[in-house]
Amino acid sequence: IRDVHMSRGLGDVHKRQVTSNEYLGVFYPSLFSSDNAGKNVVVPASHGIIRTIALSDQVSFPWFAPAGTRRGGITNASAAGFINDEGEFNSVALNTGQRDTLYSNKINPITFLTGSGLVNFGQKTRAANASALDRINVARLVIYLRSQLDKLAKPYIFEPNDKITRDEIKAQADSLLLELVGQRALYDFLVVCDESNNTPARIDRNELYLDIAIEPVKAVEFIFIPLRLKNTGEIAGL
């Protein structure tokens, strides 16, 4: 998680260069909060986003986007904005156009929504190229999956490199991924662990290959609701 410098207004946010990384997210603007002594303080966006992600994980899985009115609430700040050149905090309520501009530049906007309060309204990563990893929910799914696969594979170290071992580890991977399908993390998956990817040369190098392809679930970020007017009685005839 990274913040746009809190002494900058919206006007030049998109011009500031930030490292490209599939596991990095940038958020704007800064937040108005209070310290342990009850004094007002301006804190970086990460101060709120880390808490938002933690709260999201309490009610859902890591592959659910920590954004929007259901899981993206900012609960440890009273306003969002930036510090101006006079050192004063300027509150900002980003409108739709401003949010879209930020999001198209891979900056996740934090804004005030009537009825919901402060909300994180983005989940893009700083991925250099367009891919499933340009979204936080998919990046967190990959992190989780790599950890689980590492745990899954360790018991098979030093086991005989034969069909029985390959079938066992494939069955374990299939079970893990099938569970993720049920938990709305994956649309589909494919696991290969046989003679096609475990060639004699690889076996002679004491290697076992478990190739996995996944189709991660994407989050809804845009909803289109066309409304069409029909003449009286026309709908009944459809």
Residue positions per predicted region:
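Structured, hydrophobic secondary-structure cores that serve as assembly/anchoring elements
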Residues: R2, S7-L238
